[in-house]
Amino acid sequence: MLKTVTTAMAAGDDDVPASILEIELPAILLNESLFIELNGNLTQLVDTTSNLSQIVWNRSINGNGNSNTFDLVDDEQERAAVEFWLLVKMIAMAVVLGLMILVTIIGNVFVIAAIILERNLQNVANYLVASLAVADLFVACLVMPLGAVYEISNGWILGPELCDIWTSCDVLCCTASILHLVAIAADRYWTVTNIDYNNLRTPRRVFLMIFCVWFAALIVSLAPQFGWKDPDYMKRIEEQHCMVSQDVGYQIFATCCTFYVPLLVILFLYWKIYIIARKRIQRRAQKSFNVTLTETDCDSAVRELKKERSKRRAERKRLEAGERTPVDGDGTGGQLQRRTRKRMRICFGRNTNTANVVAGSEGAVARSMAAIAVDFASLAITREETEFSTSNYDNKSHAGTELTTVSSDADDYRTSNANEIITLSQQVAHATQHHLIASHLNAITPLAQSIAMGGVGCLTTTTPSEKALSGAGTVAGAVAGGSGSGSGEEGAGTEGKNAGVGLGGVLASIANPHQKLAKRRQLLEAKRERKAAQTLAIITGAFVICWLPFFVMALTMSLCKECEIHTAVASLFLWLGYFNSTLNPVIYTIFNPEFRRAFKRILFGRKAAARARSAKI
């Protein structure tokens, strides 16, 4: 029989030698189990067709073409290389997906722990954030691990029952996560548009929202388990493909309820929030304090001040030439009084209420210190016997202030108790070094706040020059804690500088600092507007980028049966959607400083977090 086979093979193919069945090899596998060994020569006895299908020959012809040699091809190296790269791919995929699952679990656990442990985070608004973290935690614990096994094994090997459980949990948790984003957007929209919403946002209302979210997700996820499946569902599982029901009606229902309708609602709500926030920022910027003193007004005021200084020089020369003022009967010293009035109008609103503040006694310094907030006039104060009186001053409106500035036009240089004239800026500089400044700053605050918050009205500054030569003790000393006295010559010299340079210099520089302040406010408001836009863009952008590709693919696969999507692309889109559960803890907490501080306390302990905060301060 062996001879017959040999003859038949030799007759069938001229290229095959007659001794083909005698191969100098130790052994050869035939039909997976048959070995025949004879005197070191292997003799192969098989069916001819089976033999030829399993043995690969490599033909080699010598240079003369007189003989042909056949060698068996060894694919071991190629097979080993392919298996090695498959192993590397599996390990890399397992590491990446495992890290993604771990980060998702840690992030959502941190959010839940922060809300539970930190009392200041236990408010009604954060209940939605906590429920969102629970949904994302379920995605990380129930859905992503089985999905990772599916990807690494390159097929579903866990049976149809587990496939039903996995797909149902997938739809339930992902739908709940997305619908929580809608609930948070609606909550923020109501907070912005309804002033009384903080009173209406009760725990019962928020828990009702959370219940509706989970109930809707449950309906969408359990529909296939009650018969809404396509006919090829079991066939796909047998082919190791575990997918949600591909019934066209169910896919349209599920994708619309899970993604497309929530997407439109989120985009609409955040767009309205952005528009409202932008309008409020612009309105606040318009109400902010903005001095509109023009350059022409400043120039005319400076010219008038120069004329006034020249008049004072002439008056001083007359005094030095021997002109004297009669002495009062009580012997307290001569008084030279001279009044000149100038008006400067600085408009920062529409209301025309005005008030007069006239420099006065020590006991009323706290009341008059409100004028310190208005730094565009140089207030000269005498040491003693000065009277403060206020009239028509409205603390609530702070609409306008008519400041009467007292300055000296002449001085009796021969008076031993000459007055020391100091400017407002010098008072503030000295007063900050003493304890008494705290009480005066309390008086400053209301006016400064009203100006900063954009109070309306016209500020009319009236500057009568009034000088009274009198005895010892200064209001500046009271402001600075009751210390300090000056000599007559030094006071006279200071008067000329402060009355001329102080008032004129401050007045000439009114426009520039407040223009810079207005520009700085505009930049700040623009920065706040950009930050609000960036926050909303990050929230909506992350949601759209993560889930839009998957739901477009899901709807396309159900509507277009002929369309084929590569397995790698389908897996990428699916895990990109899962990645949204990794981002949610970051997006919805990183912009909240309370959450950031809570995370630091959880990571480093309360003492370390407190030390870090004090170091920053």
From Swiss-Prot:
Record topological domains on the Cytoplasmic side: 117-128, 186-205, 278-534, 592-617
Taxonomic classification: Eukaryota, Metazoa, Ecdysozoa, Arthropoda, Hexapoda
Residue spans of biased composition, Basic and acidic residues class: 317-327
Location (main, coarse): membrane
Coiled coil: none
Record key words, sorted: Cell membrane, Disulfide bond, G-protein coupled receptor, Glycoprotein, Membrane, Receptor, Transducer, Transmembrane, Transmembrane helix
Cited Gene3D superfamilies: Rhodopsin 7-helix transmembrane proteins
Glycosylation positions in this chain: N31, N41, N51, N58
Family to which this protein belongs: Belongs to the G-protein coupled receptor 1 family.
Protein known as: 5-hydroxytryptamine receptor 2B
